[in-house]
């Protein structure tokens, strides 16, 4: 982009966007804006580390082959450290739940704030070596009391989240965010170092022609999932078959589903009867975004955002995407329940 030639354009950065949203609420003190700024900073840091990872491993930048190689292997740990520090230093968080940490992190009272953040610092990190898109997923809750924070402050249904999003590190770095009033996508301009609004008010198509699932697990699926995937491949109503697209990185698969429509499935199976994806920092944020974009998210039993987790690393099956596509698999589960 020629920034001098396009200087007249009204570039909406993510900070300006959130400040504009904040101005709609006169009682707002800017706490959420500060918190989000720190999340954005974490995303920029991780994006830079991910982009250098393969190069550092191959040629050893500045001769630090061993150190860089070690960092490459532990990029998910590095990402976790970055986000924990960014969130604590914001002074706006009280409880942090990360995919990398067995226990929740409770922020000391001198730096404590009113928000609880659940996150997966680097989802799909096993794909780093082959250059596949990976990402950070996050969800934000508000503490409704001034008592000592506990895990109960995050063990709440997803419909109580105040914001959710993900940052995808791929051919471009894109942050997709919802604060409960629609879904917006921001792309990182490397020359500016700013996330610019490039995808305002994202709406998922009502029906799609893509399904996304790991068919390697097909022999272990339940009846409704098996029937649904068969319908996708061999429709009996004369409609064209759906195309299979599966990256194996949740952020990449959900991002494509959000933009192009279709359905993402990660069902329970005989090996993982409770599902594989974690409720708090994978299922809930993605379900929140899908609903805000006009889609649906279903667990096989209920609306995903109505789940009430009992443990911070609890797992669940998930079916999310275009409204009509999810409606179809819901009907198959309802049919099985009747029988």
UniProtKB/Swiss-Prot annotation:
Q: Please name the SUPFAM superfamilies in this protein's record.
A: Carbohydrate phosphatase
This protein's major location comes to: cytoplasm
- Keywords, ordered alphabetically: Carbohydrate metabolism, Cytoplasm, Hydrolase, Magnesium, Metal-binding
A Pfam family annotated for this UniProt entry: FBPase_C
Gene Ontology cellular-component terms for this entry are: cytoplasm
Residues bound to Mg(2+) 1 are: 70, 99
What PROSITE patterns does the annotation carry? FBPASE
Q: Its Gene Ontology biological processes?
A: carbohydrate metabolic process
Signal peptide limits = none
Binding residues for Mg(2+) 2, per the UniProt record? 99, 120, 122
MF (Gene Ontology): fructose 1,6-bisphosphate 1-phosphatase activity; metal ion binding
As its record notes, the protein acts as a catalyst of: beta-D-fructose 1,6-bisphosphate + H2O = beta-D-fructose 6-phosphate + phosphate
Please give the superkingdom of this protein's source: Eukaryota
Assigned EC number? 3.1.3.11
Q: For this protein, what does the record note about how its cofactor is bound?
A: Binds 3 Mg(2+) ions per subunit.
* Localisation per UniProt entry: Cytoplasm
Q: What class of enzyme is it?
A: hydrolase
Q: Where does substrate bind?
A: 123-126, 214, 246, 266, 276
Query: Can you tell me which residues bind Mg(2+) 3?
Result: 120, 123, 282
Q: Which cofactor does it need?
A: Mg(2+)
Miscellaneous notes: In plants there are two FBPase isozymes: one in the cytosol and the other in the chloroplast.
Homology family: Belongs to the FBPase class 1 family.
For this entry, the protein name equals Fructose-1,6-bisphosphatase, cytosolic
